[in-house]
Amino acid sequence: MEETVMKPYVIGLDLGGTNSVFGIVDSRGDIKVTTAVKTQVYDKVEDYVDACVDALQVIIDQVGGIEKIKSMGIGAPNGNYYSGTIEFAPNLKWGHDGIVPLAKMFSDKLGIPVALTNDANAAALGEMTYGAARGMKNFIEITLGTGVGSGIVIN
């Protein structure tokens, strides 16, 4: 409870093939501030992460600084929750040829814990917790954007 009071916010990143949208939210899921970065203008992941951190710093300052941020979660195409990596994502210029340790890259830059998962699974979890699927035990979330994906919840 004390850490929630001291660090009341988390950062969410919806990493898409075209755009990356960031939000800082409180413990109730209320969005406090947002920003976005064009994903596809960066050929190298290092340049992408630097641009994201620069954009994030502006909204982090708006909520009182990094000391108010508990952690960050990333939903990404071909995201691997267990390794914190994006693996061979065909809709990302810098992600289609291999494995990208994106969670570690953001954690190293921001100094906070970062978790990463598949974007469709993250969307399903969000709907189950805050959205139209609240209270449902079985459903499928279909995501459409630069790519297509699905998150399946059973029991």
Task: For each feature predicted by the language model, list its residue ranges.
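Glycine/GP-enriched mid-protein hinge/lid loop-to-helix segment characteristic of carbohydrate kinases
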Residues: 2-7, 23-25, 34-36, 40-46, ...
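Short glycine-rich, Thr/Ser-proximal phosphate-binding strand/loop in the N-terminal lobe
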Residues: 5-54, 67, 86-88
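Alpha-helix termini
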Residues: 60-66, 131-133
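Conserved A3 ("GATE") glycine/threonine-rich loop of ANL adenylate-forming enzymes
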Residues: 18-19, 122, 146-149
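Glycine-rich phosphate-binding loop and adjoining helix at the ATP-binding site
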Residues: 45-53, 70-72, 78-138
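Short glycine-rich anion-binding loops that position phosphate/pyrophosphate groups of nucleotides
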Residues: 77-80, 145-147
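Conserved S-adenosyl-L-methionine
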Residues: 14-16, 73, 143-145
